[in-house]
């Protein structure tokens, strides 16, 4: 399903199959996407039907731990669904394992806020939600909910979502898979700079009249 119908590259699906983050449901042959906590313990599972629009979070799942990949870099790429995440990796493969990628399982903020809390190394967040009004509205809301200190950008896919871009990859001969990149939706507060003056730059002058004559009990008003 993922490779034939969704056109996800085999090296990408194989990577997550080997980790146990994607598997096939034996009973219904659904694709199941697993989300883990920082210790690698499964805390979430989403079942996606290979035919029709069936999708379901497995009972007991914690949406704070959605399907993701944790890299050691400072960048986090955020998507609505696991298939969007996988599609993006196919389109932008170079060095992808260095950075982090997160599916929200929709447009809620729970997984994003938990991920940022667990990963203080993240400095820059790329919101890669669908290129439609719902995706734009969700991005605006997520930016407001995120803590201060992050740089946030918005990447809009050339088509409605990243899998649709992947489906048309052969037609996009110039390799430009973005409709638009909107930079600086949020920026860290700028630290106030204080000018340092070197003593060598200070013009000194001796003022004798201030000290003479000596007045032991009075004050001199200047």
Language model: regions and residue ranges:
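TOPRIM metal-binding catalytic domain and adjacent DNA-binding surface shared by DnaG-type primases
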Residues: 1-31, 186
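Phosphate-handling DNA/RNA-contact segment within nucleic-acid enzymes
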Residues: 23-118
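Exposed loop/turn and edge beta-strand positions of beta-sandwich/beta-sheet ligand-binding modules
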Residues: 27-29, 121, 156, 217
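TOPRIM fold recognition
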Residues: 74, 90-187
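Generic beta-sheet signal
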Residues: 75-79, 125, 221
């Amino acid at each position: 399903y993922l490779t034939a119908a969704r056109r996800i590259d085999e090296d990408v699906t194989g990577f997550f199959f080997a980790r146990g983050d994607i598997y096939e449901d034996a009973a219904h042959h659904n694709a199941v996407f697993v989300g883990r906590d920082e210790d690698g313990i499964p805390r979430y599972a989403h079942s996606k039907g290979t035919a029709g629009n069936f999708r379901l979070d497995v009972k007991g799942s914690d949406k704070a731990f959605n399907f993701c990949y944790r890299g050691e870099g400072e960048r986090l790429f955020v998507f609505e669904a696991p298939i969007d995440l996988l599609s993006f990796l196919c389109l932008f493969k170079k060095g992808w394992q260095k950075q982090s990628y997160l599916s929200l399982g929709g447009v809620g903020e729970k997984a994003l806020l938990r991920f940022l809390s667990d990963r203080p190394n993240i400095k820059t967040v790329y919101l890669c939600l669908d290129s439609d009004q719902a995706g734009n509205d969700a991005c605006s809301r997520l930016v407001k909910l995120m803590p201060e200190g992050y740089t946030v950008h918005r990447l809009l896919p050339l088509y409605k979502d990243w899998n649709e871009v992947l489906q048309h990859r052969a037609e996009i001969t110039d390799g430009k898979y973005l409709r638009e990149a909107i930079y600086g939706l949020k920026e860290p507060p700028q630290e106030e700079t204080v000018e340092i003056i070197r003593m060598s730059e200070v013009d000194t002058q001796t003022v004798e009249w201030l000290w003479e004559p000596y007045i032991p009990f009075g004050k001199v008003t200047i």
